Each structure stands twice: as structure tokens, then as C-alpha cells.
């Protein structure tokens, strides 16, 4: 039976334990997700408190991290999502806010022009990030946001 949290505290506490264990054991997000059948993005988001994990996956990652049975149960609990209550001052997260501030109206206009009136789902959604070489030197981040379009329906 699925259970859910009504506060962020349980998952935030577990996230701290996950991060401590990951650091102490020198693990990577990709290594934690390996063999689970889920993407590294989904498993990372779950371990950072944003998604529940299926029981078998929760057991695998908890074992890799050295976490107890209570952690396995909490990893399966539906979290209270969205832990950013205001604009983060973390430079990496802030850049995403900045991208939306600069390009948000452009994205909205292009989505509506190409799809009509509606939204892009963050529920039926996939996220991917890849590091690629920049032909001008250095590296670039290619971030793919793949969400189902959901049209508004008159009623």
C-alpha cells in the first residue's frame, strides 16, 4: 500500500543520510542507479527526496548506501515534492531560474504556437543531461526536457 508524507522533514532527513553515505562510500549517482531498471535522473531525484522508489529498487540502493529497513520504507513513501520555497541562491539552481526568466515567455509562445493552449507535463516527463565537447573549446551541457503536452479543454 502506498504511503505519503505530509511534511518535507522525513525525506529531508533521509536525504542527508543518503548524501553522507554516498560521500563516505565514494559512490556516484550512476553507480547507485545501475541495474535498477530506472534512469540515473529518476533515482537521483528519488534519493534527493522528490520521488518514491519501487520496493526492489529501494532495497538495492539502501544496501549500496548501508541504510536500514526504515530508510527502505521511507524511500518508497510518496514525498511532499518541490523543496524550493523561493529562488535558490545556489549558482547552479539559480541559473535554471534565470533561464526560465529569460526564455520562459519564449518557450510559452512557441509551445502554444506549435501545440495550442495547454501545458507540458512534469508528471509524464523525462529528463536527461549529457556532457558534450564544445567545438570552440571546453564542454557543454545538453539538457533534454521531454514532457507530454496536455491541452486545456473547455468545459
From Swiss-Prot:
Domain of life where this protein originates: Bacteria
Annotated catalysed reactions: cyanate + hydrogencarbonate + 3 H(+) = NH4(+) + 2 CO2
Biological process according to GO: cyanate metabolic process
Entry EC no(s): 4.2.1.104
Active site per database record: 95, 98, 121
Enzyme class: lyase
Pfam families: Cyanate_lyase, CYNS_N
SUPFAM superfamilies: Cyanase C-terminal domain, lambda repressor-like DNA-binding domains
GO molecular function: cyanate hydratase activity; DNA binding
UniProt KW keywords: Lyase
Family: Belongs to the cyanase family.
NCBIfam families per record: cynS (TIGR00673), PRK02866.1 (NF002773)
Function: Catalyzes the reaction of cyanate with bicarbonate to produce ammonia and carbon dioxide.
Name the UniProt record assigns to this protein: Cyanate hydratase
Originating organism: Pseudomonas savastanoi pv. phaseolicola (strain 1448A / Race 6)
Amino acid at each position: 500500500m502506498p504511503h505519503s508524507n505530509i511534511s518535507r522533514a522525513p525525506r529531508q532527513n533521509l536525504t542527508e543520510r543518503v548524501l553522507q553515505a554516498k560521500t563516505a562510500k565514494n559512490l556516484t549517482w550512476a553507480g547507485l542507479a545501475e541495474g535498477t531498471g530506472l534512469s540515473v535522473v529518476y533515482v537521483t531525484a528519488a534519493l534527493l527526496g522528490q520521488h518514491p522508489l519501487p520496493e526492489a529498487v529501494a532495497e538495492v540502493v539502501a544496501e549500496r548506501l548501508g541504510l536500514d529497513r526504515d530508510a527502505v520504507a521511507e524511500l518508497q513513501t510518496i514525498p511532499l515534492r518541490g523543496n524550493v520555497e523561493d529562488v535558490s541562491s545556489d549558482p547552479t539552481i539559480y541559473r535554471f531560474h534565470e533561464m526560465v526568466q529569460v526564455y520562459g515567455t519564449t518557450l510559452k509562445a512557441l509551445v502554444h504556437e506549435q501545440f495550442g493552449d495547454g501545458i507540458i507535463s512534469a508528471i509524464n516527463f523525462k529528463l536527461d543531461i549529457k556532457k558534450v565537447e564544445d567545438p570552440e573549446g571546453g564542454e557543454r551541457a545538453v539538457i533534454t526536457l521531454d514532457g507530454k503536452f496536455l491541452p486545456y479543454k473547455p468545459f
